[in-house]
Amino acid sequence: MSKDGLSNDQVSSMKEAFMLFDTDGDGKIAPSELGILMRSLGGNPTESQLKSIITTENLSSPFDFNRFLDLMAKHLKTEPFDRQLRDAFKVLDKEGTGFVAVADLRHILTSIGEKLQPSEFDEWIKEVDVGSDGKIRYEDFIARMVAK
């Protein structure tokens, strides 16, 4: 961990992202780019949160990477992985029962976005207790995934 509470991997990712946004190569980015940069690093600040950061931190002119690191250490709040998983499962759990149908999950994970191969899904679903009704309790699955 670095002195500001960020891991070396985080600092490295932040440096890479910062350099991408430093389009003129002067080692600085504009305060107006802070939001998109934070989002590219896994944060999800609202516009009002960004305005508050810009005001509180007195960001009236372009700032350098060290200042950016300081800002990230103070203000970057990434969504925990378990919350991301839970939110994704809740989309499938329209009645709010805590369960999702394996068939629905299979369809989505093998046909949308970064598709799993059906064989990959079959391996993945072995990690979960599937009920006789063909559904899984997603909190159990999330607990297993987070523990790995």
Swiss-Prot record:
GO terms for molecular function: calcium ion binding. Keywords: Calcium, Metal-binding, Repeat. Pfam families: EF-hand_6, EF-hand_7. Residues 9-44, 80-115, 116-148 form the EF-hand domain. Signal peptide: none annotated. CDD domains: EFh. One of its GO terms (cellular component) is cytosol. The keyword Cell inner membrane does not apply. Ca(2+) binds at residues 22, 24, 26, 28, 33. SMART domains: EFh. Gene3D superfamilies: EF-hand. InterPro entries: CALM/Myosin/TropC-like (IPR050230), EF-hand-dom_pair (IPR011992), EF_Hand_1_Ca_BS (IPR018247), EF_hand_dom (IPR002048). Potential calcium sensor. This is Probable calcium-binding protein CML14. It comes from Arabidopsis thaliana. The gene is CML14.
